[in-house]
Amino acid sequence: MQEIKFKESFLRRYEKLTDIEKFKEISTTYLRRSIRVNTLKIGVEELKKRLETYFSLTNVPWCKEAFYISGERRDIGNLIEHSLGYFYIQEAASLIPPLVLDPNTSDLILDMAAAPGSKTTQLASLMENNGLIIANDIKYDRLKSLYINLQRCGVLNTIISLNDFSKIKGFQFDKILLDAPCSGTGAIRKSLGTLRMWNPNMIRRISRLQKK
């Protein structure tokens, strides 16, 4: 991995909040790839048998439908099983919010910043395509990827919405999932551009947006 140079202002801020040496170590290691089985279309064991032809699979401890995946092939997204919607390429940490939300099959749920759809499709799977999900995003150009992923994964209980729900009053939901904009500092190893763009003003701006 390319050597990472941290800004002095970055180090001054985060050395107060965490073990900065451990943070730097993790930031220079590759992120383990992981997938979530889409149980709307296939069983966990059936997909596991199919993928073990090409890959080594290890269970993600906190999600029984998910696996860390490794092997010589890197083109997971080109597999026919992916095109058919049998699995979603999803980071292990991203699996946690829908599990914590713990949706019921009769819930009305708002996914407030849904695109590209990893958590929306996971919610639909947990709800067994029952209940109703409003999959919203504030940016029109992000809705295409959301629509494609919902179609690919066979999601039937979801309506796509283009709204700024921070300005809309009077709606009630059983549960709301909000993946709010963040600094992305936990994902530096995926994109060094995150570190290059980082500055204190950006942190303050994002913090104000999250509070809103």
Question: What is the predicted role of each segment?
Answer:
Residues 1-212:
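S-adenosylmethionine
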